[in-house]
């Protein structure tokens, strides 16, 4: 496990995302939870982003901590997410987590899948 604590992170876990995750974890009542962000095959562009709560930190996970909340990224997904922003938006389109990824060459219209 590699851990990065509030320095210049290879993945930007934004303030709004970390505070929303903190709120959701408090609602779950399980402080051992972390937010896992990972890449899976699929979607109209080849890869898609996925989010899940996880209470297990794996040996190959990159751990980014902000506001007492852990963001977990496995080593395979990490290579595609270096330089990305993991953010939370609450606007007229709704409330949702979003990834802005400078490594994505193309993205689908909904923004949930991409290619490199």
Swiss-Prot record:
It comes from Francisella philomiragia subsp. philomiragia (strain ATCC 25017 / CCUG 19701 / FSC 153 / O#319-036). GO terms for biological process: iron-sulfur cluster assembly. HAMAP family: Fe_S_insert_ErpA. Belongs to the HesB/IscA family. Keywords: Iron, Iron-sulfur, Metal-binding. Required for insertion of 4Fe-4S clusters for at least IspG. InterPro entries: FeS_biogenesis, FeS_cluster_insertion, FeS_cluster_insertion_CS, FeS_cluster_insertion_RrpA, HesB-like_dom_sf. Iron-sulfur cluster binds at residues 44, 108, 110. Signal peptide: none annotated. Homodimer. It comes from the Bacteria. GO terms for molecular function: 2 iron, 2 sulfur cluster binding; 4 iron, 4 sulfur cluster binding; iron ion binding. It holds the Pfam family Fe-S_biosyn. This is Iron-sulfur cluster insertion protein ErpA. Its cofactor is iron-sulfur cluster. Binds 1 iron-sulfur cluster per subunit.
């Amino acid at each position: 496990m590699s851990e990065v604590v509030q320095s210049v992170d290879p993945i930007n876990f934004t303030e709004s995302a970390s505070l929303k995750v903190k709120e959701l974890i408090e609602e779950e009542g399980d402080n051992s939870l972390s937010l896992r962000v990972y890449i899976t095959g699929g979607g109209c562009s080849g890869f898609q982003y996925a989010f899940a709560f996880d209470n297990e930190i794996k040996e190959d996970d990159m751990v980014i901590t902000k506001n007492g909340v852990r963001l977990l990224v496995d080593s395979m997904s990490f290579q595609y997410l270096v330089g990305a922003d993991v953010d939370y938006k609450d606007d007229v389109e709704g409330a949702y987590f979003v990834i802005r990824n400078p490594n994505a060459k193309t993205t689908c219209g909904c923004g949930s899948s991409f290619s490199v």
